[in-house]
Amino acid sequence: MTTKLHAVVDAIGLPLRIKPTPGHYGDCPQASSLLSGLKGVGHVIADAAYDADHLRAFIASNLKATAQIKVNPTRSSVPTIDWRLYKERHQIECFFNKLKRYRRIALRCEKTLTAFMGFVHLACAMIWLR
């Protein structure tokens, strides 16, 4: 059993939302549920796994933000991307690095998803307190 974590972080790398999915689920279908209802979003920065026209339309219409999503190599039309903004994607990578400093999360010691997410939420609270 593998579990994948999808997260939304703010501009300084603090977690706003986190959602677990089974490891074989795709990344892009999870994005709209994570992003819905966020306020004050200027840019959404994501990697190529989240590159889809419907997600770009959702970001533009519902969030009134611009999508800075790396282009999937299989895409025929290439949308523009501001590479200076895209470099800020390291914030999500740094967040997952901070999260995996907690051994129970990194090694996935918990047998149930409820217990695992309990420790993930506790670690997120600890990250907020630092």
From Swiss-Prot:
UniProt GO molecular function: DNA binding; transposase activity
Keyword DNA-binding tagged: yes
Presence of keyword Ubl conjugation: no
InterPro entries in the record: Transposase_11
GO BP terms in the entry: DNA transposition
Pfam family, one: DDE_Tnp_1
Alphabetical UniProt keywords: DNA recombination, DNA-binding, Transposable element, Transposition
Similarity remark: Belongs to the transposase 11 family.
Function statement: Involved in the transposition of the insertion sequence.
Protein name: Putative transposase for insertion sequence element IS6501
Organism: Brucella ovis (strain ATCC 25840 / 63/290 / NCTC 10512)
